[in-house]
Amino acid sequence: LTTEFEIALTLLSAFIVATATMPVAKAASLYFGILARPSPDHPHDKPTALLGGLAVMAGFVAAIGLVGFLSRLPYHSIPWLAAFAIAMCLVGLLDDIVDLKPRHKLYLELAAISVLVWWGPHLDFFPYHAVNIALTIFWLVTATNAFNLIDGIDGLAGGVGIVAALSIATVAGLHQHTGTMVAALAIAGALGGFMVFNFPPASVFMGDEGALAVGLVLGVLSIQASNGGEGSLPARLAMPLLALMVPILDTLTVTVTRLATGNPVSRRGLDHSHHRLTRLGMSSNRAAVALIGLQVIAGACAIALSLVPGYDAILLIPFMALFFALVALFLMDRSFDAEAPGQLEDLPPIARVILS
């Protein structure tokens, strides 16, 4: 198969399968009562189906299976990725059904990710294997949960995921890493099918089973795309972060503000990036568009770094870091934390600096 045909077939097959199976997932969600009910965390008008992630995974697995069979590409770890994405999907499904405690969910994630890293892809940045393994596990746990945390308003997680997947696919394609490119295009196409049903007002949500699985897939593919390049170490380290910049920034700002104000990091709250933007007066739709636009900028930076030869990329990294640091500081505001334990002057000095 030609590369152009692989690209078109992957996107189209993933989109068609996800779109075709989404009504089935929605019907199953309604039948079994696996619903997101209206609450401060879910500000929608009526109970909404939560099993959209199952259809996303169906589209992803079907597309990589079809294209892999027809093109007979050496996919290496892609079958393992599909298997463990399904395993993570089951962890999320269990959470959607019984509402797991955060630490129990983390234990299950760590178990699945540790086995995946043992058998499959891992970072190859450093000469010490144990360091690469530990960093890979940390990155995949972070990426998996960070993506799950931005799934808070209609269209946001799906849109950010599509942009992230397309940027990863572009970087992988530039470095002739065809297996990674096909897998990234498959998740982008499947998320496109999901977005048909998730445009406001959404009739189905991704659910934890979808968000955790997609986050894991994007985390793994960002590693593979970075490993496939020949750029400098700083550029290769920056690429996965840029590919998932919006979820990472959201997790970073929420973690820092909660620690600074004495709140548990694992609590549920209305202090995520999309909540902060809506508190500024944006509609949910405009907040989603703004954050997706930020991910477009980050994805373009990832692609740009992959095109800059050798250590010349180091000249670009400080400017990118400054831009996203300013965005993070803009999002850190004590007024958004409804459960801050006291007045600003009562907080530790570091908290006063960050939150002023």
What feature does the model see in each segment?
Residues 279-297, 306:
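Alpha-helical transmembrane segments of integral membrane proteins
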Residues 87-94, 312-350:
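Alpha-helical transmembrane segments and their immediate juxtamembrane interface regions
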Residues 64-70, 297-310:
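Juxtamembrane "helix exit" motif at the C-terminal ends of alpha-helical transmembrane segments
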Residues 6-8, 183, 311-319:
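Hydrophobic alpha-helical transmembrane segments
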